[in-house]
Regions:
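Short C-terminal domain-edge/linker segments immediately following a structured domain
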Residues: 33-38, 64-66, 89-93, 107-112
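Active-site gating loops and adjacent loop-to-helix segments of metal-dependent hydrolytic enzymes
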Residues: 67-94, 98-100, 138-162
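Membrane-targeting and insertion segments and their boundary/processing signals
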Residues: 18-21, 77-80, 84, 107-110
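Domain-core and long-helix interface of multi-subunit machines
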Residues: 4-17, 101-179
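Glycine-rich loops and low-complexity Gly/Arg-rich segments
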Residues: 27-30, 58-60, 83-86, 102-105
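An N-terminally biased module of ancient metal coordination in phosphate/nucleic-acid-related enzymes
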Residues: 1-72, 156-177
Length: 179
């Protein structure tokens, strides 16, 4: 089989670590993958080294979060093989800081409704560079409030049309500035 050019690891909101992702690709006979974590380049060099060791070509990339002002919606730009990854680092850091603040605020909102602590959610986010909605849902699953991360409780807490929504959207840059 060819490849998968949009893979996330535990460094962002993926379920697998870098090596486990590469081993899964090898097992599935996927020859090429691109590691494109959200606003994070941290796994690209390690991924390349591990990929070479296991015969899987790893393309370094990143999924950059931004906003399309014309549509008034979030957008995600996939960037591969950047000539200047150091120039992307500042943007990734700013986006991560915004995402971290939003995640911390969502944890506090969730803790008002459920007996969970920020420390427990952070434990469920272990290995990630940020706090994502699924980390909060994972903590609630571990506490027995749901049997799945992306089920009804997830929709109730994070869907914008839910009266119980605790979702807080991070502030991201204008897509035109990113391009």
């Amino acid at each position: 089989m060819g490849g998968d050019l949009h893979c996330h690891t535990r460094l962002s909101d993926g379920s697998l670590g870098i090596e486990d992702l590469i081993l899964l690709a090898q097992k599935l006979k996927i020859e090429t993958i691109a590691i494109t974590d959200h606003d994070c380049l941290a796994g690209t060099v390690r991924g390349k080294v591990i990929g070479d060791r296991h015969g899987v070509q790893v393309i370094p990339g990143v999924e950059i979060s931004c906003v399309d002002p014309k549509r008034e919606r979030r957008a995600h730009l996939l960037c591969y093989l950047s000539d200047s990854p150091d120039r992307l680092e500042g943007l990734c850091r700013r986006n991560s800081l915004s995402r971290r603040k939003a995640g911390q605020y969502m944890i506090l909102k969730a803790a008002k409704r459920f007996p969970i602590t920020p420390e427990f959610v952070l434990k469920c986010a272990s290995g990630s560079t940020n706090i994502f909605k699924q980390h909060i849902a994972h903590a609630l699953m571990e506490c027995g409030y749901t049997h799945t991360i992306f089920g009804e409780l997830y929709q109730d807490l994070f869907s914008s049309d839910s009266p119980n929504c605790i979702s807080v959207e991070p502030s991201f840059p204008d897509v035109r500035g990113v391009l």
